Amino acid sequence: MNLNNLGGYEDSNRTLNNSLNYPTQKALSPSLKNMNYQDFLSITEREQPEALASGNTAINTVVSVTGATLSALGVPGASFITNFYLKITGLLWPHDKNIWDEFMTEVETLIEQKIEQYARNKALAELEGLGNNLTIYQQALEDWLNNPDDPATITRVIDRFRILDALFESYMPSFRVAGYEIPLLTVYAQAANLHLALLRDSTLYGDKWEFTQNNIEENYNRQKKHISEYSNHCVKWYNSGLSRLNGSTYEQWINYNRFRREMILMVLDIAAVFPIYDPRMYSMETSTQLTREVYTDPISLSISNPGIGPSFSQMENTAIRTPHLVDYLDELYIYTSKYKAFSHEIQPDLFYWSAHKVSFKQSEQSNLYTTGIYGKTSGYISSGAYSFRGNDIYRTLAAPSVVVYPYTQNYGVEQVEFYGVKGHVHYRGDNKYDLTYDSIDQLPPDGEPIHEKYTHRLCHATAISKSTPDYDNATIPIFSWTHRSAEYYNRIYPNKITKIPAVKMYKLGDTSTVVKGPGFTGGDLVKRGSNGYIGDIKATVNSPLSQNYRVRVRYATNVSGQFNVYINDKITLQRKFQNTVETIGEGKDLTYGSFGYIEYSTTIQFPDKHPKITLHLSDLSNNSSFYVDSIEFIPVDVNYDEKEKLEKAQKAVNTLFTEGRNALQKDVTDYKVDQVSILVDCISGDLYPNEKRELQNLVKYAKRLSYSRNLLLDPTFDSINSSEENGWYGSNGIVIGNGDFVFKGNYLIFSGTNDTQYPTYLYQKIDESKLKEYTRYKLKGFIESSQDLEAYVIRYDAKHRTLDVSDNLLPDILPENTCGEPNRCAAQQYLDENPSSECSSMQDGILSDSHSFSLNIDIGSINHNENLGIWVLFKISTLEGYAKFGNLEVIEDGPVIGEALARVKRQETKWRNKLAQLTTETQAIYTRAKQALDNLFANAQDSHLKIDVTFAEIAAARKIVQSIREAYMSWLSVVPGVNHPIFTELSERVQRAFQLYDVRNVVRNGRFLNGLSDWIVTSDVKVQEENGNNVLVLNNWDAQVLQNVKLYQDRGYILRVTARKIGIGEGYITITDEEGHTVQLRFTACEVIDASNAFISGYITKELEFFPDTEKVHIEIGETEGIFLVESIELFLMEELC
């Protein structure tokens, strides 16, 4: 069983360290053989490393500084701030000693590296200067707070702020001199703490000090930059120092652990509160908790021989727990064993702590969990439970002891005194040895009395073994401690921000885990597992249940998705989140910039005093890592939500306009104007009637400005395909919607199409008269969702984007009001959370998951005669396509300059050259086509065809006409192109020729335009399209096609057929009257084709004269074998020949 399985513990008989094998200890020297016990103890005590009794001034000072800092987090009030400065200066710059020098010395001792004297002296001198100026600033600040309207106090505090700030900016690099970053690290962290506290004052008081808003913003942005910079520096060099001390022996681990413990106290604890100096994020007093765990030294006398004892890695893996949820010690069950003395004349027997197991609770939980056994229970002589239930153990006094043998020593702990706020608990194997090991030497209190000013509480005990050659392993306990701020209850206050670390959960999701934190978060992190459920926190609400709270979560991830907060198993908050980094590693490797905040716009009230808070993820973009640092509760007043709506709307309205409110900002879209109007609509008219009315007038004015700058006609889609307005033209498959959750006004719904030649489309041409030369215009709009939606803007050429946008703006269950109408106010939070056009991604020419879109078009010179204009087109050409979009606009973006100007001039020149080439080409085709058409008709009025005109000749003329390019736009075949007038003129003459051809033809459906209609056919006959013509196909020798027609007797007719034979055999067309008079046309594959008579390769036209003797005649089409294709069969009077 894993003792750090955070989902819950079980009782276990697991014994730690029973199988460790260590090298046999070397025999003691003869002088030690003859030494008595007290002499031996004197030697072992002299062998203790210098840092053993580390209850020194440096550590004492930093725990006091940390305590003072924790009490002044956020914006606690003016008196707290001045008292903070007063206390800090007293701690860091006392009159009787140089604390900063002791900071350096403490770390120098731990890492055995001295700071070069010049760098040391320079840093100390500059620190002295900072202290002097901080004292002056503190006094100036206090004077101003007492006399805020006095110009003299204002001037003085401003001057002292700027001087002190400049000194910090100048001196901070001296506290990170290259090569000495680690021994200077405590100095750096403490100085950074003061600088960030100072910069907070600029944001808090800058407006009262008459700083410009730019100056306040500059200082605030500098503070945010320094929070990140200082945090990352502290963690980087802490890790560097720790890795430097990595070793292989027990003694090396002792020093390694001391460095870790003391640098957590001196550096990382302070770095953990840096973010809370941000007065905009933490705008009131803030309660936070340091949940990291530190380990005091093993309770043991020094090992006399380095060859015995566990290795470095064994110590780290055995004594140090893996990351876990915060737990609280409830009971130690301790086993006592005995070492028999070598001689009672020298020393007594040792009754020692040989094994134990730990029972504990997690935050605000009654369930008790018990670990397996640490140590060895075999041969124990007694055991007992030592209860600490609800009793913070803030200090331990222990009696480490040793039994001396001629060739070995056996170590053990005879007794431990546990000091608790509710009383003491005493473990006593015996009482023959003194209580010499005091935990407050390593974890000092923040003053006297200790039971009130203690800084840490005992939370757990592990154990290690020291090997002897002849005896079983001795068990040495190691105590772990949490900071006092990590209290058992997760109290949520009515008057300050509560920051609850995620590791204060009492239950994790099945696959969620606790991972090592990066160092600047004050503890470890919770990492999500394979599903969305992260875990549960129990809280205690120390406020009336009517109190409202804002909620935010600090997290790090490279995925996007939705973060859900449940209270008492009821979903209460939902919000989309974006990735904070592109790539992410393990929790310990994260930097300050890896983290972001999910902040909910909706406030909450707790349903009871002890709610269960569940954190849950959904809609994740992939299965990557997600880390939770903390969840925060910010108390707000009862009208906070309405006030927030008002302030949000006011800010949104102000951002719509340029200075003077004469125009809209360039980046303001028509969609944004609509969304701002929704914000205004959501303002409470009861609480803020005047403000709402004023904002409504402004947003209506903004909408008028939006209409006025939009070059598109009919932006609300009221007159599509109107003959009265030259606006939008569209196909079938378009529906106009009105007023839903996303769009306030009209919007478009496109459906897919069954035929790519006839897409669903909507287009409009912007007239040249509306445009300015050498100007850029932008097409903008908003898409709720789409697939295969193509957007075009066209002038010299077409700019084209395919827009695929996920339907991810709103939850599955949409909020509605009591009338069943869209509740836009409730839905607004979902729209706020979704990405804008800047968050889009382009792949293979497809713009994905960007709800806002924009396409540029640059204009060159203006020519009103050409009226090139700008074409705007939307279309869907697939069956699966769909789109829901609106707020379309084309607006002026600004002049085209620089490279863009050169590019548009080049485009225009290229377009004009192509147009000239097209004009020349078209003129030549027009001449040919006109001549071909003139040859078809018998007169200038095109009222009769010449008698010898064949179908092939008409089709040939049509082919010439169809070779005219740019008759229709390439991007949409229904939109006329530059050659449309010419093409139309010629096409109408072609159609006239076909009409006359059909009129004179006695054979019904002789061109098979209506398939097999009017023909009697066998089942294997078909009609297929070929090169724009319908062709009759006979595939078998027994296929037969028949038609009876009625003619004039004694009149002459011409039978004219255009056909093609494929393969052997022949095809034929026979005409027979009722008296048996028959004529026949035959076609074979080997006939020589008259090029002048051919239309398509292989097709030829033949004709013959026929004089019927009866009115009724019979026409038959057939073949002997192979394939026979008939394009046209014509029978007409030959009266024109007479």
Swiss-Prot record:
Superkingdom of origin: Bacteria
Identify the keywords attached in UniProt to this record, alphabetized.
Sporulation, Toxin, Virulence
**Short name of any one Pfam family annotated for the protein:** Endotoxin_M
Q: Which InterPro entries match?
A: Cry1Ac-like_dom-VII, Cry_V, Galactose-bd-like_sf, Pest_crys, Pest_crys_dom-III, Pest_crys_dom_I, Pest_crys_N_sf, Pest_cryst_cen_dom_sf
Q: Which GO terms describe its biological process?
A: sporulation resulting in formation of a cellular spore; symbiont-mediated killing of host cell
- Mind telling me which SUPFAM superfamilies this protein's record contains? delta-Endotoxin (insectocide), middle domain (SSF51096), delta-Endotoxin (insectocide), N-terminal domain (SSF56849), Galactose-binding domain-like (SSF49785)
Q: Any idea which GO molecular function terms this record carries?
A: signaling receptor binding; toxin activity
Query: Which PANTHER family would you find in this protein's record?
Result: ENDOTOXIN_N DOMAIN-CONTAINING PROTEIN-RELATED, PESTICIDAL CRYSTAL PROTEIN N-TERMINAL DOMAIN-CONTAINING PROTEIN
Family in the record: Belongs to the delta endotoxin family.
Functional summary from the UniProt entry = Promotes colloidosmotic lysis by binding to the midgut epithelial cells of Coleoptera.
Further comment = Toxic segment of the protein is located in the N-terminus.
Q: What is this protein called?
A: Pesticidal crystal protein Cry7Ab
> What is this protein's gene name?
cry7Ab
